[in-house]
């Protein structure tokens, strides 16, 4: 996560994530950023073995969809989602015939101002598996936290930026050492069968879950609006 006060060592982060065999990276920027500064960050992650780099960034009227598309063309693993936009739109990758999954630019109206804007679970947030491996991950592991490691705006290392427990700070701690921590890894194995109410839900194996906004570790997510006992969604909470 990145805000106006963040001062991350992106080179160190890129090296350690590659050593951990990380394949997918997401940057969440709660502020605008000039393209030159954004490129300075991305340059640390290029020519490394990352399959996709998703950049969630705040809308800036001076930066056009074409500007983002050209930057994504320069760094083919990168895609952009521009939040807090006045209009919604989707723009296909300039390299879609070569890299059909990445390189796109999407503008969304949703305001994302902090990590508190995460964790909403509704009937639009379910992720249906693409294959047996994806399905079994939902059965055996936690869909949100399995093999995930995060750095919040202050550099604190967590399972998720929205969670409270801190395992160190990237300024003086290693992502590799944190991944060896049994307490950190325990959340990877917290599947839906161990969570109250969720274990009875028919969506449990396709739900992304959330362990940040909860009363305790084994409770249903507070931002989930589904009742599996009467098969109903509370539509008022879905927005």
Task: Mark where each language-model region is.
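A C-terminal junction/extension of Radical SAM enzymes
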Residues: 74-160, 206
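Short, aromatic/basic amphipathic alpha-helical patches
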Residues: 12-18, 38-47, 66-75, 93-98
